[in-house]
Amino acid sequence: MTSYALVGDVGGTNARLALCAVATGEISQAKTYSGLDYDSLEAVIKQYLSEHKVTVEHACIAIACPITGDWVAMTNHTWAFSIAAMQQNLGLKHLEIINDFTAVSMAIPMLSEQDVLQFGGTSPQPGKPVAVYGAGTGLGVAHLVNVDSRWISLPGEGGHVDFAPNSEEEDRILAVLRQELGHVSAERVLSGPGLVNLYRAIVISDGRLPENLAPKDVTERALADSCTDCRRALSLFCVIMGRFGGNLALNLSTFGGVYIAGGIVPRFMEFFKASGFRGAFEDKGRFKDFLQDIPVYMITHQQPGLLGAGAYLRQKLGYTLHP
């Protein structure tokens, strides 16, 4: 009889829950719930378990916020809870609450060639450090290292490092955003809201008034080539994604690869392929040659957060991770 654990991937908007086969890591019966419809994460979990008529002893939930102790307060949601209290209330033997990009990073050892697209570089070097980042509601970042055949995720809040412009155009963008925001982090330009910030800053720096656009509007107009400012914004987004990814690669010499996750880039994949992303990734002056061989991958797996939450839990339970 198959033994299942509960896994979850919770963002600022939705909570995705599923079952993970403990022996194999296979994810099944995934369902997405709107976070606006429930007063707490615990209520969502109880609803899922009731609907699927399943009892579990182990669970791992990935959440889009820092995890620094027993008390968890979500960054982009009103939900807050005690891990110990939730474990007791749900009757679980084992509950892990991890950062969302810890989960995404832990999915990487489970990915097959069919789950990724490569953007330049050569083959990854086995056992070498890995970086993963992704733009969605915010900008998530993590690294992954292999120690004694176990994968260790190094989560952090890398999306909140300073935005570091490296061109005259980016200097103008920073000047506009600094006037509005004060501190300008990388997330302020590499995220859904960040894409809008880029569009607005481009228009304002030209002495004009921007329209009130949503991220979807900027992307659609850019792809339709119906708005020069939107196309400039999307092009700049791709370039800054490349610069940021190159910075991550330098941090830990990630010859195991740099992986991109998140909900934004897959919406304009062909545009991204033709953009200045890879050139910006390698544009590190004296260290250009150092970065040329490092492969970059787009994660195309539909649920890397769930897959990684399961992988994290299974490794805690003593299993070895592989696709």
UniProtKB/Swiss-Prot annotation:
EC number: 2.7.1.2
Gene Ontology CC terms: cytosol
Keywords: ATP-binding, Cytoplasm, Glycolysis, Kinase, Nucleotide-binding, Transferase
InterPro entries: ATPase_NBD (IPR043129), Bacterial_glucokinase (IPR050201), Glucokinase (IPR003836)
Molecular functions (GO terms): ATP binding; D-glucose binding; glucokinase activity
Compartments, record wording: Cytoplasm
Amino acids binding ATP: 8-13
Protein family according to the UniProt entry: Belongs to the bacterial glucokinase family.
Stated name of the protein: Glucokinase
Organism, as annotated: Yersinia enterocolitica serotype O:8 / biotype 1B (strain NCTC 13174 / 8081)
Name of the gene this protein is made from: glk
